């Protein structure tokens, strides 16, 4: 299968790309950083013409759309980049999907559920309305709405995956990264942890 991974050099995209290649797929990577490698395509998904060029001379059976700005605080501080990359970027990919008919896997986020204060059990997501509390979450929810709209209007096929607290090799530390990345960094550097509300809480890390 010929597969395109947008954001394929990121903390999630890079290991996904390696695994897909290990399974024998022909994998192309699109990312906005300067890099070299097999089947690498430099592209900022927020720029329509750059996205259009990805599909001019090649076809794909499946696209994993991971390219996005990450994190709630990053989104609050750099909201213009967030909306351009996340919302406009996904719309650009959807335009290509409507034209070329490839299937897609879109990585959304658990952030779309908001800050639920009760005990999180399996059916909460079915019973409690989604309530966005930050720009990052809103862009992910907007993307899901765009995807469902495209499916209704054009018959596109996309699986939406809401990832929870991803972490792993290759994730660099910054104040905008995930809580797991920050906790590990603080542990390695003997720094205190900041826990909000109280310490009588648990999460599926």
Region spans (language model):
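NAD(P)-dependent short-chain dehydrogenase/reductase
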Residues: 118, 145-204
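Conserved Rossmann-fold NAD(P)-dependent oxidoreductase catalytic core, especially the SDR/UDP-sugar
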Residues: 59, 91-133
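Active-site segment of SDR-like NAD(P)-dependent oxidoreductases
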Residues: 69-73, 110-117, 164-167
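Active-site helix of classical SDR
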Residues: 135, 139-142
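N-terminal Rossmann NAD(P)H-binding glycine-rich loop of SDR-like oxidoreductase domains
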Residues: 3-23
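NAD(P)H-binding glycine-rich loop region in Rossmannoid oxidoreductase-like domains
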Residues: 45-85
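Catalytic Tyr-X3-Lys loop
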Residues: 76-91, 95, 138
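Rossmann-fold cofactor-recognition segment
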Residues: 36-47
């Amino acid at each position: 299968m010929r597969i395109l991974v947008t954001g394929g050099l990121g903390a999630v995209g890079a290991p996904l790309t390696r695994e897909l290649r290990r399974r024998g797929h022909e994998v192309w990577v699109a990312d906005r950083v300067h890099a070299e490698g097999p089947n690498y395509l430099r592209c900022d998904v927020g720029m329509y013409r750059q996205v259009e060029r990805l599909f001019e001379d090649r076809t794909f059976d499946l696209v994993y759309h991971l390219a996005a700005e990450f994190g709630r605080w990053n989104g609050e501080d750099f909201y213009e980049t967030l909306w351009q990359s996340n919302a406009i970027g996904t719309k650009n990919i959807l335009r290509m999907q409507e034209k070329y008919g490839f299937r897609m896997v879109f990585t959304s986020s658990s952030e779309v559920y908001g800050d639920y204060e009760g005990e999180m059990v399996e059916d909460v997501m079915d019973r409690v309305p989604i309530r966005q509390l930050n720009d990052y979450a809103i862009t992910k929810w907007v993307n899901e709405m765009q995807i469902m709209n495209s499916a209704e209007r054009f018959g596109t096929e996309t699986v939406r995956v809401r990832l929870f607290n991803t972490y792993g090799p290759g994730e660099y530390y910054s104040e905008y990264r995930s809580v797991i990345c920050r906790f590990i960094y603080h542990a390695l550097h003997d720094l205190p942890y900041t826990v909000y509300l109280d310490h009588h809480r648990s999460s599926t890390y």
